[in-house]
Amino acid sequence: MRVRARGTTGRRATKTSPRLDLLGTMWNIHHGVAQAPRKRGTTLRERLQMVEEEAAVKDVLTRYAYFYDGADLDGVMSVFHDDCMLINPRGTYIGKDAIRRNYAFLISLSKIVLHFATNVMVRFKDDAEEAWMTAYYYGVAATPDSELIATGGTYADHLIKVKGDWKIIERRITYNLRHTLSPAPPGRMPGAPVPTRKQSSRDILGSGSEM
C-alpha cells in the first residue's frame, strides 16, 4: 500500500502504503483501499493484535462522531495529529489551528446533529504503524432556524500511531447529497401508557424544539 497525496503536503511515500491520490475521485480512493491486501498475522498473538489495532482505528471515527455531535470541539481535535491536513468541499486546511476553525464553524451551524458511519474499511502498512480508513457517512441535523436536513458523503483517513494512539494525519471528506426531513410530531403517541415520571429523553437533549 503506497500513500501519494498529489499536490497536498508531500508526505513521504512508502512501498507498503495504499497508492492513493487525495485529490483524485472518491472512488479511486475507496477502491484503492478495498483492493489493498488485508494484513494478517501468522500467529494467534499477531492475529489478535491486528484485531485490536483495527478496532482502535475504527474507534477514532466513532469518537470523532460523538465529539462532533456533542459540540465538543476539543474532543474533535483530539483525534487529529498536530501535523494534520483536511480536504473538504470548501478547500484544504493545513495544521490544527486551521482545522479547528473549520470545525468551530461547522459545529455552530446546527442545534443538534447525529452522524452515522457505515461501510468502514481499514488497511494497515506492514508494520501496523500507519493505516488507511474509508467510510460512508450519513448525517442528520437541525439548523438554528429549525430546518431538518440530512447529508451524505465519504471519509478517507490516513492515520499514524503516536505513543500508542491512532491520530488522523490526513483526511478527505466528500459531500455528495443533501435533502430535507419532516419533523417528528410533538407530544406522546395516542394510546401510549402514562410514564412514571415526566422527565423524558427530550429533557436530556434540550427543550425538544430541536426535534
Describe these PLM feature segments.
Residues 17-74, 78:
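Short, low-complexity N-terminal intrinsically disordered segments enriched in polar/charged residues
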Residues 68, 80, 137-139, 172-175:
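Short beta-strand segments enriched in hydrophobic/aromatic residues
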Residues 115-117, 150-155:
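Short, surface-exposed coil-to-beta transition loops
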Residues 18-32, 37, 130-132, 152-186:
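Short beta-strand edge/turn micro-motifs at domain boundaries
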Residues 179-211:
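Acidic/histidine-enriched, glycine/proline-rich intrinsically disordered or flexible terminal extensions
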Residues 3-5, 13, 21:
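Acidic, Ala/Val/Gly-enriched low-complexity intrinsically disordered segments
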Residues 73-141:
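A solvent-exposed, acidic/Ser-Thr-rich amphipathic alpha-helical stretch
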Residues 139-148, 179:
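Short, cysteine-centered beta-strand-loop-beta hairpins and adjacent loop/turn segments enriched
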